[in-house]
A protein has these predicted regions:
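Sec/Tat signal peptide C-region and signal peptidase I cleavage site
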Residues: 15-19
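Sec-dependent N-terminal signal peptides
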Residues: 4-13
């Protein structure tokens, strides 16, 4: 039925529209041009909007798929010339979409906040301030790791580190290390964050590489880090991530080599 409606709309409007099934990666590929600092080209925004309109609603079934489509529409809307792209404006737009969508379960607070997590606007101080203040006034926001991103955007680096550390999301480890080194001047906190790589869920290769580069450049040999603790950390990184070598040696070999070279120094 969704494809029939799209075909009828295309015929009435004289525009060729081809319905496509929902694909999260395809949605992102078609809207990522709107996720930039500054103003996207009008043609880019138009193409993104038209792609979202072409997605067959009958293939958007699961709650996460519905959230992904709303998130995508919020992103495109925020890049559209002449609209109210303030946090209040985006919230009103998203709330209207949510009201017209049937969910199996209500959104959690972190899921809702994710609709407005336009990280490329973290240097827009008014947007950052409004979004941050909304989160601080909303119970449950402390479970949204990117509260730390918006705290950092406002110069609240201690809070940003604490939010990240409490949530322990893998993608925030490098942020914690950088905040601790560049803004808090606290190698101990940087090391505590780095050690999260060896506890719980594994990090991706790029995440491990970024963290290990900073460990090598700024923590190895630092008097604030006891040698025995650093050696233990390096051993654990070697043990945990060597397991990934056989399946993807090209990606992991340089990373594991660096870890082992650092271990040899001890």
């Amino acid at each position: 039925m969704g494809k029939l409606f799209l075909l009828m709309a295309a015929l009435m409007g004289g525009v060729a529209v081809h319905a496509v099934d929902f694909s999260n990666s395809a949605v992102w590929d078609n809207i990522k041009g709107c996720c930039i600092r500054g103003v996207p080209e009008a043609a880019t925004v138009k193409a993104a909007s038209e792609y979202l309109d072409s997605v067959d609603a009958n293939t958007v079934k699961a709650d996460w798929q519905k959230r992904a489509m709303i998130r995508a529409r919020v992103i495109v809307f925020s890049s559209t010339a002449g609209v109210d792209a303030s946090f209040a404006g985006l919230k009103a737009y998203a709330d209207n979409l949510i009201a017209g969508t049937e969910f199996a379960k209500p959104m959690s607070v972190p899921e809702y906040l994710g609709l407005f997590n336009n990280w490329w606007r973290n240097d827009d101080l008014q947007y950052a301030k409004d979004f941050y203040e909304y989160m601080k006034a909303t119970p449950g926001s402390e479970k949204f790791p990117d509260l730390g991103l918006w705290a950092a955007a406002l110069g609240k680096y201690e809070e940003a580190y604490d939010v990240y550390f409490a949530n322990k999301a893998r993608f925030t480890i490098i942020r914690m290390v950088r905040i601790a080194l560049d803004h808090l001047d606290d190698p101990g906190k940087a090391f505590a964050a780095a050690k999260l790589m060896v506890s719980g869920q594994s990090c991706t290769a790029p995440q491990v590489k970024e963290v290990m580069n900073l460990v090598a450049q700024r923590l190895i040999g630092n008097d604030a880090i006891p040698e025995a603790e650093m050696k233990g950390f390096l051993k654990n990184v070697n043990r945990k991530y060597t397991a990934y070598l056989p399946n993807d040696p090209q990606t992991w070999e340089p990373i594991i080599s660096q870890v082992r070279n650092l271990l040899d120094a001890y």
